[in-house]
């Protein structure tokens, strides 16, 4: 399954079942729709009976579609996602596709690969990097930094960075890395951030494990695209505030630090 890059909008229409469907949905949204179409039973997430906005996955009172930022970027993102990852309301690959127009999303399978993914990896405009810890690969493939943006444009035929993110649990990501031979020829970008993860929607026993959106922000920072990195971080924080407000049944602070950081990056809300 795959979804090509695209920008989703805040508007939606209602399906015959009464569930909203995003208009001009982005890559992860389209992958979710494709995955649901082949599912033998409905995917029931926590709070699924609340009636979620199809474009931001939050209940109407907490909808953030009007706040959604979009930042022009030179780099792109290719998400290779575990089987049900796109179905999870807390998935943060979705947030990357919100912000970065050049985002692709593909479902992973051990025995098959989407031809569209192979076409993307072979596209001469892109220089793909598999983002994964360098401890799991031979040193000759590992990079810990990227050339400055101006050097990237001058070298490698002006190729644009394409960050390949393996989106799933840590065990799923390791399996995807080991059992995807089409990734074996690609350089591996190994991140070594000084900070620890601030992700609050799922638990991890390792503070150095970052959620997918945090990893993307680190990649854009390495690529010299600081505004994209900061916007991804702020958008994750706003989404997290709204998501936890619903889960914990707490009042929502529309003037929180996260909202103010996002507004400073994107301008006044409409």
Please report, for each region that a protein language model flagged, where it lies by residue.
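Short, solvent-exposed amphipathic alpha-helical segments in soluble enzyme
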Residues: 93-99, 121-122, 147, 179-183
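C-terminal folded domains that constitute the principal catalytic or ligand-binding module
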Residues: 162, 171-270
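Short cysteine-rich clusters marking metal-coordination/redox-active sites
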Residues: 53-56
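Short Cys/His-rich Zn2+-coordinating modules
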Residues: 30-46
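Short microdomains enriched in Cys/His and/or Lys/Arg
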Residues: 66-93
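S-adenosyl-L-methionine/SAH cofactor-binding core of RNA-modifying enzymes
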Residues: 101-174
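Short metal-coordination and nucleic-acid-contact micro-motifs, chiefly zinc-binding Cys/His arrays
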Residues: 49, 59, 73
């Amino acid at each position: 399954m795959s979804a090509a890059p695209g920008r989703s909008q805040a508007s939606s229409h209602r399906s015959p079942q009464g569930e909203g469907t995003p208009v001009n949905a982005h890559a992860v949204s389209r992958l979710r729709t494709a995955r649901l179409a082949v599912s033998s039973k409905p995917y029931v997430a926590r709070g699924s009976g609340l009636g979620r906005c199809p474009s931001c996955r939050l209940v109407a009172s907490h909808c953030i579609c009007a706040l959604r930022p979009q930042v022009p970027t030179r780099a792109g993102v290719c998400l290779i996602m575990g089987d049900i990852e796109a179905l999870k309301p807390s998935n943060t690959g979705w947030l990357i596709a919100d912000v970065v127009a050049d985002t692709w999303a593909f479902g992973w399978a051990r025995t098959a690969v989407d031809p569209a993914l192979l076409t993307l990896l072979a596209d001469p405009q892109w220089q793909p990097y598999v983002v994964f810890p360098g401890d799991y690969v031979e040193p000759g493939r590992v990079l810990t930094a990227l050339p400055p943006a101006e050097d990237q444009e001058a070298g490698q035929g002006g190729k644009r960075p394409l960050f390949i993110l393996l989106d799933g649990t840590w065990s799923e990501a390791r399996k995807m890395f080991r059992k995807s031979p089409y990734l074996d020829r690609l350089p591996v970008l190994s991140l070594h951030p000084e900070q620890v993860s601030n992700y609050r929607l799922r638990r991890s026993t390792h503070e150095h494990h970052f959620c997918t959106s945090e990893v993307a922000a680190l990649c854009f920072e390495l690529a010299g695209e600081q505004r994209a990195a900061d916007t991804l971080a702020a958008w994750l924080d706003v989404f997290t505030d709204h998501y936890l407000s619903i889960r914990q049944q707490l009042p929502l602070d529309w003037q929180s630090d996260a909202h103010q950081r996002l507004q400073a990056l994107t301008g006044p809300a409409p």
